[in-house]
């Protein structure tokens, strides 16, 4: 299928901080504060740095295998997990806060970008393997940061008396928002039906994992 694409400069989106825009633009003023700007050469340098700082891959493999235990996942995911045992495998990591209902589209963009970068790195450095890793930062935020989501012109706010790490919160009191979102969807449209199933089966259990796994 042919697709037309348009590249939009980060700065024109007005969705990123000046720090991020300057970093992507390789502003020399940032040089004293960073190790390197993103480039193929900097990726090669990072490979050499990581090779000098090995980790216990057996523990890494076991922990991630335990996290996936009992879940349905693709053969590619299984292959990637086993690749972690090799000293020639490196990870491309990205993370996101556990925003309700996935939060902004940027959540999906970050996952897609990590997958694409891992594939590009394999082309750049065919002697090595690269595994994209996405994880949720569930312990370092509060409800004020992640407790709302904008759908169209409406802002939905998680009304809860719970406190502490959001990753440990019970999602039962998201029921009113779930019902409001379900009312907006059409079960006769395949993509919308998929979202409805996610809301019904996941949110009220494992929505974020169910949403991100197919990506």
What do the PLM-derived regions correspond to, one by one?
Residues 1-215:
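N-terminal targeting/trafficking signals and adjacent low-complexity tails
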């Amino acid at each position: 299928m042919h697709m037309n694409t348009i590249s939009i400069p980060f700065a024109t989106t007005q969705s990123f901080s000046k720090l991020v825009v300057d970093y992507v633009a390789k502003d020399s003023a940032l040089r004293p504060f960073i190790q390197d700007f993103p480039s193929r050469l900097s990726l090669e340098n990072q490979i050499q740095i990581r090779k000098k700082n090995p980790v216990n891959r057996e523990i890494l493999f076991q922990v991630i295998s335990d996290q996936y235990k009992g879940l349905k996942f693709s053969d590619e995911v299984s292959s990637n997990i086993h690749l972690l045992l090799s000293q020639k495998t490196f990870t491309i990591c990205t993370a996101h806060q556990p925003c309700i209902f996935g939060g902004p589209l940027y959540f999906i963009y970050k996952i897609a970008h990590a997958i694409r970068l891992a594939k590009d790195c394999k082309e750049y450095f065919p002697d090595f393997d690269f595994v994209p890793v996405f994880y949720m930062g569930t312990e370092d935020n509060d409800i004020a940061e992640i407790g709302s989501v904008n759908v169209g012109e409406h802002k939905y706010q998680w009304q809860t008396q719970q406190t502490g790490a959001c990753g440990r919160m019970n999602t039962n009191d998201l029921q009113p928002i779930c019902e409001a979102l379900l009312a907006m969807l059409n079960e006769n449209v395949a993509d919308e039906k998929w979202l409805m199933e996610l809301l019904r089966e996941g949110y009220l259990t494992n929505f974020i994992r169910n949403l991100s796994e197919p990506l």
